[in-house]
Swiss-Prot record:
<feature type="disulfide bond">
    <location>
        <begin position="101"/>
        <end position="135"/>
    </location>
</feature>
<keyword id="KW-1015">Disulfide bond</keyword>
<feature type="disulfide bond">
    <location>
        <begin position="98"/>
        <end position="117"/>
    </location>
</feature>
<dbReference type="GO" id="GO:0005576">
    <property type="term" value="C:extracellular region"/>
</dbReference>
<dbReference type="GO" id="GO:0005615">
    <property type="term" value="C:extracellular space"/>
</dbReference>
<dbReference type="GO" id="GO:0046626">
    <property type="term" value="P:regulation of insulin receptor signaling pathway"/>
</dbReference>
<dbReference type="GO" id="GO:0045600">
    <property type="term" value="P:positive regulation of fat cell differentiation"/>
</dbReference>
<dbReference type="GO" id="GO:0030154">
    <property type="term" value="P:cell differentiation"/>
</dbReference>
<dbReference type="GO" id="GO:0006954">
    <property type="term" value="P:inflammatory response"/>
</dbReference>
<dbReference type="GO" id="GO:0045087">
    <property type="term" value="P:innate immune response"/>
</dbReference>
<keyword id="KW-0395">Inflammatory response</keyword>
<dbReference type="GO" id="GO:0006935">
    <property type="term" value="P:chemotaxis"/>
</dbReference>
<dbReference type="GO" id="GO:0031012">
    <property type="term" value="C:extracellular matrix"/>
</dbReference>
<dbReference type="GO" id="GO:0050994">
    <property type="term" value="P:regulation of lipid catabolic process"/>
</dbReference>
<dbReference type="GO" id="GO:0005102">
    <property type="term" value="F:signaling receptor binding"/>
</dbReference>
<protein>
    <recommendedName>
        <fullName>Retinoic acid receptor responder protein 2</fullName>
    </recommendedName>
</protein>
<dbReference type="InterPro" id="IPR046350">
    <property type="entry name" value="Cystatin_sf"/>
</dbReference>
Length: 163
């Protein structure tokens, strides 16, 4: 049985997650990420999500943290028209590999966001640790810093009696 599970896990990881398989929070996170991406001034063309490599949502007291890795490809439309259904992916259009970390509060209020979408040729040059650090900051957005207890956070020592 174990021999079957490992190849299955590897195959599922290679196939990726389809948009239809995303949870409601993950779909909302993807929508926020696409809106944020198309707001940036350097982006002139509309991009369309072509695949979702991984999607994880984690509940926290302040809301849901969504971490997405997905790919975008340039379309034939300008960026202001990115939501239009007639925008088709250009076969030779630029491709981007994105990391999005979104913290959604109650009533889909966005508490924090990080959207990083370098062009696919630049992906290897970007330091992953920097994006992970920023992603952790987004994950902690809206949380009470005193709501978690970590071992060693408080240390008390009892004085020895005087002799």
């Amino acid at each position: 049985m174990r021999r079957l599970l490992i190849p299955l896990a590897l195959w599922l990881g290679a196939v990726g997650v389809g948009v239809a398989e995303l949870t409601e929070a993950q779909r909302r996170g993807l929508q926020v990420a696409l809106e944020e991406f198309h707001k940036h001034p350097p982006v002139q063309w509309a991009f369309q999500e072509t695949s979702v490599e991984s999607a994880v949502d984690t509940p926290f007291p302040a809301g849901i943290f969504v971490r997405l890795e997905f790919k975008l490809q340039q379309t034939s439309c300008r960026k202001r028209d990115w939501k239009k259904p007639e925008c088709k992916v250009r076969p030779n259009g630029r491709k981007r590999k994105c990391l999005a970390c979104i913290k959604l509060g109650s009533e889909d209020k966005v508490l924090g966001r990080l959207v990083h979408c370098p062009i696919e040729t630049q992906v290897l040059r970007e330091p992953e640790e920097h994006q992970e650090t920023q992603c952790i900051r987004v994950q902690r957005a809206g949380e009470d810093p005193h709501s978690f207890y970590f071992p060693g956070q408080f240390a008390f020592s009892k004085a020895l009696p005087r002799s």
